[in-house]
Curated annotation (Swiss-Prot):
Pathway membership, UniProt: Isoprenoid biosynthesis; isopentenyl diphosphate biosynthesis via DXP pathway; isopentenyl diphosphate from 1-deoxy-D-xylulose 5-phosphate: step 5/6
Protein name (database record): 4-hydroxy-3-methylbut-2-en-1-yl diphosphate synthase (flavodoxin)
Residues where [4Fe-4S] cluster binds: 304, 307, 350, 357
Family to which this protein belongs: Belongs to the IspG family.
Disulfide bonds: none
GO MF term list: 4 iron, 4 sulfur cluster binding; 4-hydroxy-3-methylbut-2-en-1-yl diphosphate synthase activity (ferredoxin); 4-hydroxy-3-methylbut-2-enyl-diphosphate synthase activity (flavodoxin); iron ion binding
Species: Rhizobium leguminosarum bv. trifolii (strain WSM2304)
Length: 416
């Protein structure tokens, strides 16, 4: 039998650390969660509100679109408003086509942003491409800002792709078009990074990303980048889609890559429902990292799926209530109860796995299943502490969870 260590996550790939407005990406630092607004950046009120919501949800970096003069002019005002709210969240400027001009024409914007995102596929075309790319890099050097060279297969450098396709056609054993496209994505990122360094931007100011919309392609291009460079890597499945499909696709793709030690910051690109909550993408990113054991953001609530033994909905409602209460209270608890994000709660529906799972949790309850005695044993720190009975079992257990948090994690604050 193979040692169990063989199945543990691979050691994190060694990468160069990049400081993004005080948040370290790469260099062995915890994998950073980031997100992006979908507001018109020129609408300062809406953008500030959404950045604040994303940051409160746990986004450590927030990207905003900078697509025209009005957007660029709004950036320093957005930054100032956020600071007045007590939110020193690094803002990343997302530039396409005219980034070189916007940064030059709006120096306050260039200074206010914590990082610039450049797309090699549309930074410029033909003879203007390298010149306009260089202008952005020179601005990054002037303002001491990092950049992300963000390649996306939807806007891939067509000159590079054509050259590689022509070269492949002449090969004795040509690759598939999909394989050549992957190679073009990787080369675009690496060639752009090399050019940035040649211009004078140090490696500890460069992050790379290769965005695709298919799971296997994301695994391939990021594995290739990891083999060929030590740049910090940003992971994300672009156009992942809506709802369950987007969550599953992003989780499958990034989970595999992260398990192999690759990735320094992640963004889950979910298409929100009309008027939906943008913070959902932050929650999913956190949950990917937490369920894989890489970071802890929020207490875990383990709950059984239910079966014929659990015809009552009490355990489902209780699990949902506790999860909702945790999310609602975490902004306060995170400050008031250091370490609370490591808490494990179990809400189980019958005697089969209920007691065992509850013992594994910090605090757990095994509710009675169909035909079982109407009593619910509660386990605290692996031992049976008491048994709840009567019509208020759910409310009583919720109170016990809060009491446990106050006693266990509140003591840390007092001791400090």
């Amino acid at each position: 039998m193979s040692p169990t260590a063989d199945f543990d996550p691979k050691p994190r790939r060694a990468s160069v650390a990049v400081d993004v407005g005080g948040v370290i990406v790469g260099g062995g630092a915890p994998v950073v969660v980031q997100s992006m607004t979908n507001t018109d950046t020129a609408d300062i009120d809406s953008t500030v509100a959404q950045v604040a919501a994303l940051h409160r949800a746990g986004s450590e970096l927030v990207r905003i679109t900078v697509d025209r003069d009005e957007s660029a002019a709004a950036v320093p005002k957005i930054r100032e408003r956020l600071l007045r709210l007590g939110m020193d969240v690094p803002l990343i400027g997302d530039f396409h086509y005219v980034g070189h001009k916007l940064l030059a024409d709006h120096p306050d914007c260039a200074a206010a942003l914590a990082k610039y995102r450049i797309n090699p596929g549309n930074v410029g075309f033909k003879d203007k491409k390298d010149k306009q790319f260089a202008e952005i890099i020179e601005m990054a050097i002037r303002y001491d800002k990092p950049v992300r060279v963000g390649v996306n297969w939807g806007s891939l450098d067509q000159d590079l792709l054509t050259a590689l396709m022509d070269e492949n056609a002449r090969a004795g054993s040509p690759l598939s078009a999909r394989q050549v496209t992957r190679e073009a994505i990787v080369q675009s990122a690496l060639l752009s990074a090399a050019l940035a360094e040649e211009i004078g931007l140090p490696r500890n100011r460069i992050i790379l990303s290769a965005k695709v919309s298919q799971v296997q392609d994301l695994i391939a291009v990021n594995s290739m980048l990891a083999e060929r460079s030590n740049h910090a890597l940003h992971l994300g499945l672009t156009e992942a889609g809506m709802g369950t499909k987007g969550i599953v696709a992003s989780s499958a793709a990034m989970g595999f890559v992260l398990q192999h030690g690759i990735g320094d910051t992640i963004r889950v690109s979910l298409t929100p429902e009309p008027n939906g909550d943008r913070t959902r993408e932050v929650q999913v990113a956190q949950e990917i990292l937490q369920v894989m054991g890489f970071r802890q953001f929020i207490p875990v609530v383990a709950a059984c799926p239910g079966c014929g033994r659990t015809t009552s909905t009490v355990f489902q409602e209780l699990a949902q209530n506790i999860q909702n209460d945790i999310r609602k209270n975490m902004p306060v608890w995170r400050e008031k109860y250091p370490g609370v994000e490591a808490l494990n709660v179990a809400v189980m529906g019958c005697i089969v796995n209920g007691p065992g799972e509850s013992k594994h949790a910090d605090i757990g309850i095994s509710l009675p299943g169909t035909g079982e005695t109407p009593a619910a044993p509660v386990f605290i720190d692996g031992k049976k502490a008491l048994t709840l009975r009567g019509p208020n079992i759910a409310a009583d257990f919720e109170a016990l969870v809060v009491d446990y948090i106050e006693k266990r994690f509140g003591q840390r604050t007092a001791a400090e």
